[in-house]
Amino acid sequence: PIMNARVDFKVNQPKKILLTKKDYPKDLDFFNKDFLEVYKSKDLKKILNSLSLTDICSILVEAGPKLATSFLEARYVDEVIVYTSSKALGENGISWFHEDNAIENYGFKLESTYKISDDIKQIYKKDE
């Protein structure tokens, strides 16, 4: 993943932050431009406090099921955007949503749904 805005007009690209417990290949496109920092800590509160001391005022988290669940359980999320592909995950795919881990269990409600080509985009907001 490149994790940038791919549009045909000038735009401020997001700063990139990698949260990982593993070694990572530094030759990936992800690291080529506007790279900010790598955090190997598991302490989300410490990481977010560190980011709050910079010019970052909001973050977009693109994560797998474990990290996404960590953000939700710590109540660091106010909006969830889910893209559902029409393609199957395959044998080794990890599904995040199941009955015990439904997004509604974290206090979110579905606000809108959009069809984008063959995919579905759903936006959930914190139900306060």
Where do the protein language model's features map onto the residues?
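Enzymes that bind and transform nitrogen-containing heteroaromatic metabolites
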Residues: 1-128
